[in-house]
A protein has these predicted regions:
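Membrane-embedded multi-pass helical conduit in multi-pass membrane proteins
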Residues: 27-57, 63-71, 75-79, 342-438
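N-terminal signal-anchor transmembrane helix
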Residues: 55-115
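Acidic donor-binding segment of Leloir-type glycosyltransferases
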Residues: 108-152
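Long helical/loop segments within the catalytic core of UDP-sugar-dependent glycosyltransferases
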Residues: 135-141, 145-165, 169-170, 183-268, ...
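Acidic donor-binding loop at a coil-to-helix junction in glycosyltransferase catalytic cores
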Residues: 268-274
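Catalytic donor-sugar/metal-binding loop of nucleotide-sugar-dependent glycosyltransferases
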Residues: 275-293
Length: 503
């Protein structure tokens, strides 16, 4: 990673810790001597914040209907002729033995010349089960299995950085193990990069779930994805605002990605962080009208692990970029600086305080407490009522619109249960805060392959495979491995127990 960039290796700088301590002390003093005044100011600030956040997202969503993702018509694909620049595909793997077969089958369906393609499967050297599955797949070029040193931090961005060092393609894309990209996605990305300005260094493909009907959780999750990738991100790109990347199907100009320094290995939402750095450099992200199919989390525990990691990463990213607010405003511009506050700062804060506000509302309805009533003078009360009623309606309407955009019409009625989903978000947010203090760089693994494939997997073609080793040993810089003992043991004895991963 580029040493000139701030990193999440340190959660709080001394300056941030000092400011935080001063704010806490000031709050304690106000609570001690001016309890009601402080409470009213706090209630007014929260109410106003909700109103601003709701208005911001409403404007973005309405504008999204005017301009969708970047489309690549058939004639533009045909206009490429035989020109196919080299392309690198990075796939970080850890404990993915169950999905390796389908992953390989999906990547083999990519409509791109094999001699112009480099597919790097990045696997930690002590992940015996996944290595055995890769061995069974009997891979041939353009597949390469790169053994990664299982060293700290054991995160996806660290592994991606090692892949970036090895990448030989003019363009580069990152996929997750459960991804099923459309076969022509690489060609569409090439055509889009060809017609877009050089300042566009990243294309985010649309993500959709292939199992939206599994249960209530997947229905709500799929609708959320519909609003995010089909509405919010295209609108952000249209207004040239910072775009929070998804963790997969990010297509890059490789040279620009290297110039940025790759990913922050200590940030558990490295995609969000990278999207902000792209904006700070004056570069742009666009959304590509090509779909990558993913597996929606169908189990609450698995969903909470994933969402708490995302929210922890949002807080990490906010703290990293706000270490120098004046520099951030100068590099982003005032408009984009304010958008950053709404997109990155307000997201975890809203999830954290939602249950507190719901609790206050319920307590007032049940008890009629005069103390709670005094917290909300008439001006604050009416703004709060409008924000609560209209805001909740609008967010449910967003989810219904997401269902319509994805043709999940049967799921629309279930969006009325969205408050249950928001409650789960709040639980995940508080879990994220606790984990940020205790284990800031811990990567909670999301289990894949929990839902049966909707279509049968394509049989992998047999061939020869061996781990990529240079001069009979793994280089000590960690590019294709690191600690030789761990790597050689994984290659020789694939029955050893797995003891590591993206943590």
């Amino acid at each position: 990673m580029n040493g000139s960039r701030d990193s999440a290796v340190c959660t709080l700088t001394r300056g941030q810790a000092a400011v935080g301590a001063a704010l806490v002390m000031a709050s304690v003093l106000l609570l001690r001597f001016e309890l009601m005044t402080f409470a009213i100011i706090l209630a007014a600030a929260v109410t106003l914040g909700y109103a601003v956040l709701g208005s911001f997202k409403t404007v973005l969503t309405v504008n999204a209907l005017r301009r969708g993702p970047v489309r690549v018509p058939r004639h533009e694909l045909e206009g490429l002729g035989g020109w196919r620049p080299t392309y690198t595909v990075l796939v970080p793997l850890y404990r993915e033995a169950e999905v390796v077969r389908n992953l390989v089958a999906s990547l083999r369906q990519l409509d791109y010349p094999p001699d112009r393609l480099q597919i790097l499967l990045l696997c930690e050297a002590d992940d015996t089960a996944t290595l055995e599955a890769l061995w069974s797949a009997r891979l041939t070029p353009p597949f390469e299995v790169v053994l990664v040193d299982p060293s700290y931090p054991r995160t996806k961005p660290k592994v991606c950085n090692l892949g970036l060092e090895r990448a030989s393609g003019r363009y580069l894309v990152v996929y997750d193990a459960e991804d099923r990209p459309e076969p022509d996605q690489l060609k569409k990305a090439v055509a889009a990069f060809r017609k877009l300005p050089r300042s566009v260094i990243c294309l985010q493909a649309r993500l959709e779930y292939r199992n939206p009907q599994t249960n209530l959780l997947t229905r709500l999750f799929a609708a959320e994805y519909g609003t995010f990738y089909d509405m919010l991100l295209p609108s952000l790109a249209r207004h040239r605002l910072p775009v929070p990347l998804g963790g997969t199907s990010n297509h890059f100009r490789t040279a620009a990605l290297r110039d940025l320094g790759g990913w922050d290995p200590y940030n558990v939402t490295e995609d969000l962080d990278l999207g902000m750095w792209i904006g700070r450099r004056g570069w742009r992200v666009e959304v590509l009208d090509s779909v990558t199919w993913e597996e929606a989390n169908s189990r609450v525990g698995n969903w909470l692990r994933q969402r708490s990691r995302w929210l922890k990463g949002y807080i990490q990213t906010y703290l990293v970029h706000m270490r120098s607010p004046l520099r951030l405003r100068r590099e982003l511009g005032t408009r984009n600086f304010l958008a950053f506050q709404m997109l990155v700062g307000a997201t975890p804060v809203a999830a954290l305080i939602n249950p507190l506000l719901w609790g206050l509302t319920a307590a007032y309805v049940v008890t009629g407490s005069s103390f709670i009533a005094h917290l909300f003078p008439s001006s604050v009360f009416y703004v709060g009522i409008v924000s609560m009623v209209i805001g909740n309606f609008v967010f449910i309407y967003y989810l219904v619109t997401g269902c319509m955009l994805l043709s999940h019409h049967r799921n629309a009625k279930w969006m009325l249960l969205a408050p249950l989903y928001w409650l789960l978000m709040s639980i995940a947010a508080w879990k994220a805060v606790i984990q940020l203090m205790a284990r800031p760089h811990y990567w909670e693994k999301t289990s894949h392959g929990l839902v049966a494939e909707e279509e049968r997997a394509i049989e992998a073609t047999p061939g020869d495979w061996r781990p990529h080793v240079l001069d009979g040993e793994l280089p000590r810089n960690g590019l294709a491995g690191g600690h030789q003992a761990a790597a050689s043991a994984a290659a020789r004895d694939r029955k050893r127990a797995v003891s590591g991963g993206f943590q």
